[in-house]
Amino acid sequence: MTRTKDEKGMEGLKGQIQKGKGVDIGTMFVKCAHKEGDEIVFKSQRNAFFEVEHTDFTKKILDNSKVKYIIKEDNLYVVGDEALQFANMFNKDTRRPLSKGVISPTEKEALPMIELLIKSVVGEPAHKGEIVYFSVPGEPLDAEFNVLYHIKMVEGFLKTLGYTPKPINEGHAIILSELAEEDFTGIGLSFGGGMVNVCLSFMSV
């Protein structure tokens, strides 16, 4: 049986620790971390966008300045850190693709914006199928919405980029990061811009 190139590549990874990446998709920021040698490298983008006038001149200026933007129909949207700069300059508010920790159901432009923001921080996978864990909030106690839609959309964005996405509760992620000496038993608290997440764990469960 002939093995494919991808199968041979993955076979070479067996017995090694697959480092992968971690992505925190928050209401305020989208952040990514991965390891290069002994160093952990972080990339961050503000989770926001701002609509500007769509003209050829504006597009040329943004291209020359390497500003991230999306053109949709007749509209041009600046995303990330630069969106806040534009909003401050025009004394207006930015718009956010997330609300209460999940993709906003009332923001019609949320999906293309969060997709571009995720792409800008995770980049290309080191190999096809590289694992990336992404944070998700728990089910809310004071609202009636399901996080499943949010999870499936983010999974789809990451799969399109060539990753193998795996969701992880953000409170649980803190426990796995900080409580190894306590056998991953304790309480993890995550204070975000849209929600506060609490996770109680006993021996990592």
Stretches found by the model and what they are:
Residues 197-200:
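Short, acidic (Asp/Glu-rich) active-site segment that either coordinates a divalent metal cofactor
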Residues 1-191, 203-205:
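Nucleotide/phosphate-binding catalytic cleft detector across ATP-hydrolyzing
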Residues 193-195:
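Coil-to-beta-strand transition motifs
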